[in-house]
Amino acid sequence: MTEQPTTANQMWGGRFAAGPDAIMEAINASIGFDQRLYAQDIRGSRAHAAMLAAQGIISTSDAEAIGEGLLTVLSEIEKGDFPFSTALEDIHMNVESRLKEIIGEPAGRLHTARSRNDQVATDFRLWVRDQCDAAIAGLDALIRAALSQAEKGADWVMPGFTHLQTAQPVTWGHHMMAYVEMFGRDLSRFRDARKRMNESPLGAAALAGTGFPIDREATARALGFERPMANSLDAVSDRDFALEYLSSAAICAVHLSRLAEELVIWSSAQFRFVTMSDRFSTGSSIMPQKKNPDAAELIRAKIGRILGAAVALFVVMKGLPLAYSKDMQEDKEQVFDASDNLMLALAAMTGMLTDLTANRERLEAAAGSGFSTATDLADWLVREAGLPFRDAHHATGALVAMAEQAGIDLPDLTLEQMQSVNPAITADVYGVLGVHNSVASRMSYGGTAPAQVRAQIARWKEKLEEKSA
């Protein structure tokens, strides 16, 4: 006769005549990944126990035993001595079971006025809040590295691109400051997300609250939350905080990927705009000459995992009725993986930018290619010859075609050639056709003129110092 599984190890087993099938245990268990929440779980449980004692719901001696026992559990986990069990499903039941082994009967009082629903919502929210802080710190370091690059090359001229074709001259500093702005918005998004998630679900119990006279304000304060969540159903159903974290991570990931792509292109022999540090490059097993931008390529690839995690959790959450459904167990792996990859990508990009050498001579040599000052010529025709911009655009296009056919650049056209297209052109036009004059003229707010770039660098330095003060 086949032996039936039992519910002996299950804290919810009282209502069941038989235990779960092995396949059920396998699909139900989350301890393989949610053990990462151990510190948050223990922190939440200690706050809950202290509150229960303060409210006279459990004795002070039981609360003290629970608090000390949980510290023992924490120590065992951090030393690698903790006996994690798949049969106990998750981090919450593993911790409580071990606590019972350590302190006995008082451990059974810990779960008074609490459900795993508000427990996991609290643990996970605490963990994601910590990850917002980590992302903010990582982005701060990355912004500083990009600012350093911008400061070095505030007046280094380089080609600006649209469609990966030469468009207009810009400066290296201006290009780097574009990423500072992007990463700055990312940092703000994580700060905003952190503010919204900084409310405590603890005390919502399963979904309806509890009849015990608990003090949710006290546990919220103890855990560093601003306030308890106002609706118990929402408190256990909500995963907006995880979705907001993933959304912020996904947008940041796109910015990292765009910069990684540019570094891969720019480091190629065909561009030679930048030289990667040996510390963030690898070689080939067969081609001795190779120096591959693997760190940038791996950042670009890992970004796909972050984007995938965001989509996956949105899909999990989109069809769930209130309140808790077991589907929500699938929230954590997505966030864990996205966080791991985001923090690695931020650190790698910061290291790459810190060590990166921009090749000024190559940048400046390329800046004038592709008739990059054609727009300056058209603007000159508007200002000096009084042409409507569309007519100036047409005349400039004709001059570009003339230069292209002759195999020369715009500044190499003779005045006679230029006047054959428009007689109003004078020798003064040559003053706007140089790349340095072109960038210096872009003095509009946010423009590429070195003075504007330096002003933006100073603004960002001040902004960062204000935030860190």
UniProtKB/Swiss-Prot annotation:
Record-level GO BP terms: arginine biosynthetic process via ornithine; L-arginine biosynthetic process
Domain of life: Bacteria
GO MF annotation, one: argininosuccinate lyase activity
UniProt keyword annotations, A-Z: Amino-acid biosynthesis, Arginine biosynthesis, Cytoplasm, Lyase
UniProt xrefs under InterPro entries: Arg_succ_lyase_C (IPR029419), Argininosuccinate_lyase (IPR009049), Fumarase/histidase_N (IPR024083), Fumarate_lyase_CS (IPR020557), Fumarate_lyase_fam (IPR000362), Fumarate_lyase_N (IPR022761), L-Aspartase-like (IPR008948)
Pathway(s) annotated for this protein in UniProt: Amino-acid biosynthesis; L-arginine biosynthesis; L-arginine from L-ornithine and carbamoyl phosphate: step 3/3
Substrates-to-products reaction catalysed: 2-(N(omega)-L-arginino)succinate = fumarate + L-arginine
Subcellular location: Cytoplasm
Gene3D superfamilies given in the database record: Fumarase/aspartase (C-terminal domain), Fumarase/aspartase (Central domain), Fumarase/aspartase (N-terminal domain)
GO cellular component term of the entry, any: cytosol
Pfam families named among the record's database cross-references: ASL_C2, Lyase_1
Tagged with keyword Nuclease: no
Enzyme Commission numbers on file: 4.3.2.1
Similarity-based family: Belongs to the lyase 1 family. Argininosuccinate lyase subfamily.
PANTHER family reported for this sequence: ARGININOSUCCINATE LYASE
Name of the protein in its database record: Argininosuccinate lyase
Species: Paracoccus denitrificans (strain Pd 1222)
Gene that this sequence comes from: argH
